[in-house]
A protein has these predicted regions:
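Extracellular glycoside hydrolase catalytic/binding regions
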Residues: 21, 53-56, 60-61, 142-172, ...
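Localized chelating/binding microdomains
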Residues: 35, 40, 54, 67, ...
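N-terminal carbohydrate-binding accessory modules
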Residues: 7-79, 92-100, 335, 339-344
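Aromatic-lined substrate-binding rim segments of carbohydrate-active enzymes
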Residues: 58-137, 151-156, 164, 196-210, ...
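A mature extracytoplasmic/lumenal domain signature
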Residues: 43, 84-86, 132-134, 177, ...
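Short active-site-proximal "capping" loops at secondary-structure junctions
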Residues: 47-49, 85-89, 215, 223-224
Length: 344
């Protein structure tokens, strides 16, 4: 029979040891030879660049690739979360019209740019979490605290991404960004159902294409992706539950780490999708990095940008898009760069 995460004949998803397909086993993400995968790096904005480049007439995939080169070759990251950004209209939340705002279902050139960026990252031997970050299909039902969840419309976007990257072993897929509210867990079951449906949409595309199941990251059920506890007793069921990772965003003091990721990581494969100097001190960040490495949890800093705080880069853009600017680390960036220089 077909084993979830493997190729249709049930054999190893990659053809042999050392090949690049990832899979989950127990509470870890592993490489083809069974070794625990040690992925770490940072978030990287797509061509929209945290709204910094949406107004420019041209689009700049080459700039995203240049920053990926810096992050991988110089800072020594081997894992990048590529944050996809789209809006409901050219003017939503903006005093002037954006030139670039449509999502992958409506802007073929944007999707092609994303493919070229992801191919570029993969050619360098790094993995990329292709993640919906700002997307108009996310639920916005603040009246019932369903904000930031994936919807049926989101699932259509995820299906397109799954088809686009179906044969790319270096790609992981992120369902959404940050489910908000639900601090008391009262909506956990409904949030879980939305996530499970999203994973099912991706698996349907993969199975139809006859390709291995990619790692899919589902986000914490509330508190801006901070709550993983429901998944401990209710792991995702779609696709047999295999090759699903559980993504948490951490901007808290070290005392909160057990409830945020340490406890969940005892039984679940966890990804820390964001962390950084916001409410955290440098000491808190260093504790997180040490604990993540000890527990073999992939982790991604926020963010390799100059105006999307907490910023890893100094703003040398003169307030613009930043094409060709010097990629100079901030103090936060230097802290991350120093840690990435230490082998894990």
């Amino acid at each position: 029979m077909t084993v979830p995460g493997n190729v249709p004949d049930g054999t190893s998803p990659d053809g042999g040891p050392g090949a690049p397909w990832l899979h989950t086993s127990a509470n870890h993400i592993r490489t083809a030879d069974g070794s625990v995968w040690h992925g770490r790096g940072a978030n990287l904005s797509d061509t929209r660049s945290c709204n910094a480049c949406t107004y420019a007439t041209a689009s700049y995939p080459g700039e995203v690739m240049r920053r990926a080169d810096e992050l991988i070759d110089v800072w020594k990251a081997n894992f990048i979360r590529l944050d996809l950004e789209s809006y409901a209209s050219a003017t939503v939340g903006s005093p002037t019209a954006r030139a670039h705002w449509q999502g992958v279902l409506d802007d073929a050139a944007y999707l092609a740019e994303l493919k070229s960026i992801v191919d570029h990252i993969g050619a360098k031997g790094a993995y990329v979490l292709v993640s919906l970050w700002a997307d108009p299909t996310f639920s916005q039902r603040s009246d019932v605290s369903e904000v930031g969840w994936p919807t049926a419309q989101t699932n259509a976007v995820l299906a397109e991404l799954a088809a686009t990257f179906a044969s790319d072993p270096h790609v992981l897929l992120g369902v959404c960004n940050e489910p908000q509210g639900n601090f008391d867990g009262a909506l956990d079951a409904r949030a879980w159902a939305a996530m499970d449906s999203a994973v099912a949409a991706i698996r349907s595309v993969e199975d139809a294409a006859g390709v291995p199941h990619h790692i899919v990251a589902v986000q914490g059920t509330g508190g801006w992706a901070r709550r993983l506890d429901y998944y401990v007793t209710h792991p995702i069921a779609a696709g047999g539950g295999a090759n699903v990772a559980y993504e948490v965003h951490v901007y808290n003091r070290a005392a909160d780490f057990p409830s945020l990721f340490v406890n969940a990581a005892q039984t679940l494969p966890v990804i820390i999708g964001e962390f950084g100097l916001a409410n955290m001190t440098e000491g808190d960040v260093q504790v997180l990095q040490r604990r993540a490495e000890q527990l073999e949890i992939p982790h991604l800093a926020w963010t390799f940008h100059m105006r999307c705080p907490p910023n890893l880069l100094v703003d040398n853009s003169a307030g613009g898009c930043g094409v060709g600017m010097e990629l100079q680390p901030t103090a936060w960036g230097q802290l991350l760069k120093n840690r990435l220089a230490i082998p894990w």
